[in-house]
């Protein structure tokens, strides 16, 4: 074959290509194949036997493998050639910083899309700074062609300090929002004004737009009064036990309470002390709907007032006692379908529920009292409110509706700091989340169509659509954009233009904390990369992805290569903060979720038992007991590490701090700077788990290790309305909370203490307690994890009802449906059931203690010391 034959030409070009002293990226490989596509086609179509043709075909078929091998050899050689350069890179700044091999490989890798997975305490900022320095000094990249992006101003300042100040390299470091704003400025002839707080426009909508439009006001009030509280039917529970626990920790408060119209003076049946109730607390959101309807229509009622006729000593509390004229009516609401029962209950439980309904019906028939009934659902498709209205009108109760404008006025004036404000904040949160996903107006109609069978969601979406249109109109009129627009509008601008139509002179886009990226930021990054041919370097750790509530989507990190089309995944596994024992515990814990990227972090130091679970007695004086346990941990730290050791107190929520401050063992002398009265020289900082991310302290105390709605893991349920637009990680139970707990565990350089109540420990701790190198103090593994107080009759949680229609302080009642279990007690130790007094008929037999003998007995609440009351008493065996 002659020298100009296709095979020889391809071989020569390939040898020049593969022997270049550089890392070959996929784009460069693609360009090579595209430039030589005609040669490749000729070779494939004109096969003949020769050594050159076999060699050319081998190149065509295996060029990707050869490029990978070339890159590995190149990096291996560069590690040797650049060793002295890397060794000395930080010597003028900090002689203790020495880049490890994984960091150096990450710096030398020049793939188009690279993901650097940097474990906690592995020197992520150091790696990014070193990468920039290498690009500028070794690859002669102009600093103006490098864009470094992080998420917070604090993180931006840290990168600027390291790169701009220490290395004297003038690369641009920016937040995503500032980056988007700068892009918009390139195509704007006028100054761009940014709205920093959406509250002013949204509040204006309520105060001006809403109250002057009768139809809109009517629709708003209907939703607000009857549907703002989340119906339990809209929530998902893994078990019936979880459902009852949810009911236990939620207060269902009526509109009458919220408007200040509920104010009752009560005399405690047992102690005879007088107290005032200013809140009407119901059992369910459906009961709140009924109470609100009665209140709005001027129907007088009492909630759970004892039925006047005794039946074999059983206490019967009808849901509503209704008064109209001289007549008294009773209304029972049943939390099942009129015919179909409730799918939360099994067949036996539904049978017992029906039996309870029949019993109440017979009781009212026997005493000739009028009973009305409502159900959670009906076969005719009408809602609860429609059937309630029919029941009331059928029984001759006249409904006189309050004026809607008066209700709204009273609502906005009396609830500015509570319920009404909560709804405005909910609207702000919804619109922010809606826009952060890049949704436009048309998305409302799509969402309404998707959820057309959910009346509550549809009502809110229609309201939110009108609010969104008003909000966007006000932005436009005032020439404003909000923070979401900085990113959304810049993406919209870029996706409609071609290369060369905008000045985006970037060769590298380096993104810090990439695990926190949202879809709108991802889309913007891809468009900038498309228009500038910039390489994208994503740096982060999926184990620390904890900002889903702000729109972050961890799958954009874990599926980086798939979403980009290809890429290189690199790991930095040496951690310089934690001990090997601690990262083994934390790593095992977070990798219980198989969707997390597998990695084995390596530490330079060893410390036996770095995780200490500290139990405290939560039976009495919980606040002091918890604070005392924290103080004991500080004492141990001082004894082991001295009083110069820095201590971080981590809470799940900011209010965890106040549980400590209320104990009088601690005080706050500056924002989040805490002093212990017993150890005043110790430097103590308080941060939430989210705020602690990225920081390191000598020792850490996690002060909230409890189970519950505000525990760790947090069990706050999102409103289902938010869930339709929220990013949810359902890969594992409490997936994000598990990652957040990992963040909290890894803030320490030495030990982490976790404070937990002995009777209600976090489920995370019941898991950790069996791990190697986890120590438990002030308790034992045997008694660790006693559960909450349960009903002795049905085993569901007991709810404390300080204010109740029986006028018994500290009453505990079963959280189960009344039709299934009516257990009530006033003593959690003995758990004897309260019953109607058989002697006086209007008192109740409750647990009392003899002042002299200290023995317990059942005594009537109508007892009086002068013997003028009821003296009925029973011995407790």
Feature locations, PLM:
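Helicase P-loop NTPase motor core
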Residues: 116, 122-128, 273, 566-567, ...
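P-loop NTPase Walker
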Residues: 2-193, 746
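Conserved helicase C-terminal RecA-like lobe
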Residues: 243-249, 642-646, 681-682, 687, ...
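Helicase C-terminal subdomain and adjacent C-terminal extension
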Residues: 722-732, 739-743, 749-830, 873
């Amino acid at each position: 074959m002659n020298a100009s034959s296709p095979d020889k030409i391809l071989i020569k070009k390939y040898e020049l290509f593969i022997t270049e002293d550089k890392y070959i990226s996929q784009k460069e490989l693609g360009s090579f194949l595209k430039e030589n596509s005609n040669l490749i086609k000729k070779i494939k179509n004109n096969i003949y036997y020769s050594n050159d043709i076999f060699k050319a075909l081998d190149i065509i078929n295996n060029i990707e493998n050869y490029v990978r091998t070339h890159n590995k050899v190149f990096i291996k050689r560069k590690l040797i050639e650049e060793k002295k350069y890397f060794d000395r890179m930080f010597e003028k700044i900090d002689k203790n910083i020495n880049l490890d091999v994984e960091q150096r490989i990450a710096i030398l890798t020049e793939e188009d899309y690279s993901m650097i997975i940097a474990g906690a305490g592995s020197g992520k900022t150091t790696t990014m700074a070193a990468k920039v320095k290498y690009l500028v000094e070794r690859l002669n990249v102009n600093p103006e062609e490098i864009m470094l992006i992080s998420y917070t101003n604090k993180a931006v300042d840290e990168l600027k300090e390291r790169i701009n100040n220490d290395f004297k390299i003038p690369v641009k470091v920016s937040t995503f929002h500032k980056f988007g704003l700068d892009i918009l400025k390139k195509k704007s002839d006028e100054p761009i004004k940014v709205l920093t707080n959406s509250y002013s426009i949204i509040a204006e909508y309520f105060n001006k737009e809403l109250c002057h439009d009768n139809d809109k006001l009517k629709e708003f009030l209907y939703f607000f009064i009857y549907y703002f509280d989340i119906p339990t039917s809209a929530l998902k529970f893994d078990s019936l036990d979880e459902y009852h626990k949810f009911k236990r920790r939620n207060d269902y408060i009526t509109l009458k309470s919220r408007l200040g119209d509920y104010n009752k003076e009560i005399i405690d049946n047992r102690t005879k002390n007088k107290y005032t109730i200013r809140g009407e607390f119901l059992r369910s959101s459906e009961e709140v709907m009924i109470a609100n309807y009665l209140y709005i229509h001027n129907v007088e009622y009492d909630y759970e007032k004892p039925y006047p006729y005794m039946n074999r000593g059983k206490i019967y509390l009808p849901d509503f006692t209704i008064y109209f004229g001289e007549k008294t009516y009773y209304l029972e609401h049943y939390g099942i379908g009129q015919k179909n029962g409730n799918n939360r209950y099994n067949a036996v439980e539904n049978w017992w529920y029906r039996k309870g309904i029949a019993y109440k019906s017979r009781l009212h028939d026997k005493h000739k009292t009028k009973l009305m009934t409502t159900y959670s659902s009906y076969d005719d498709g009408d809602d609860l409110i429609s059937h309630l209205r029919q029941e009331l009108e059928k029984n001759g109760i006249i409904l006189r509706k309050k004026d809607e404008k008066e209700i709204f006025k009273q609502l906005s004036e009396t609830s500015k700091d509570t319920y009404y404000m909560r709804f405005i904040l909910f609207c702000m949160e919804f619109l922010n989340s809606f826009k952060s996903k890049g949704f436009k107006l048309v998305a409302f109609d799509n969402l309404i169509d998707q959820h057309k069978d959910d009346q509550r969601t549809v009502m809110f979406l229609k309201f939110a659509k009108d609010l969104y249109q008003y909000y966007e109109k006000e932005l436009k009129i005032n020439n404003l954009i909000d923070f979401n627009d900085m990113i959304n509008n810049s993406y919209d601008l870029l996706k409609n233009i071609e290369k060369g139509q905008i000045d985006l002179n970037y060769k590298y886009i380096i993104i810090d904390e990439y695990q926190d990226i949202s879809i709108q930021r991802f889309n913007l990054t891809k468009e900038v990369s498309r228009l500038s041919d910039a390489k994208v370097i994503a740096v982060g750790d999926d184990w620390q992805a904890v900002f889903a509530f702000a729109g972050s989507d961890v799958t954009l990190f874990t599926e980086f290569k798939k979403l980009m089309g290809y890429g290189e995944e690199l790991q930095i596994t040496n951690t310089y903060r934690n001990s090997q024992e601690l990262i083994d515990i934390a790593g095992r814990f977070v990798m219980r979720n198989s969707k997390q990227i597998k990695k084995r972090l390596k530490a330079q130091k060893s410390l036996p038992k770095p995780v200490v679970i500290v139990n405290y007695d939560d039976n009495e004086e919980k606040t002091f007991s918890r604070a005392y346990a924290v103080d004991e941990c500080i004492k141990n730290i001082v004894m082991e590490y001295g009083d110069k050791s820095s201590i971080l107190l981590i809470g799940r929520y900011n209010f965890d701090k106040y549980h400590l401050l209320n104990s009088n063992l601690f005080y706050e002398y500056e924002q989040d700077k805490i002093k212990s009265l017993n150890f005043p020289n110790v430097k103590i900082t308080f941060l939430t788990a989210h705020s602690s991310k990225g920081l390191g302290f000598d020792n850490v105390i996690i002060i909230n290790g409890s189970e519950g709605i505000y525990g760790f893991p947090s069990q706050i349920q999102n409103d289902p309305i938010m869930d339709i637009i929220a990013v949810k990680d359902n890969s594992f139970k409490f997936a994000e909370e598990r990652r957040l707990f990992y963040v909290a565990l890894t803030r320490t350089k030495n030990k982490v203490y976790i404070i937990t109540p002995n009777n209600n420990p976090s489920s995370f701790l019941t898991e950790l307690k069996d791990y190697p190198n986890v120590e438990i103090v002030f308790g034992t593994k045997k008694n660790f994890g006693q559960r909450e107080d349960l009903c002795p009759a049905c085993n569901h949680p007991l709810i404390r009802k300080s204010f109740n229609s029986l006028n018994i302080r500290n009453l505990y009642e079963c959280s189960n449906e009344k039709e299934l279990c009516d257990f009530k007690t006033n003593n959690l130790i003995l758990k004897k059931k309260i019953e109607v007094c058989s002697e006086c008929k209007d008192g109740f037999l409750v647990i009392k203690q003899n002042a002299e003998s200290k023995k317990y007995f059942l005594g009537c609440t109508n007892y009086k010391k002068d013997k003028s009351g009821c003296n009925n008493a029973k011995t407790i065996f």
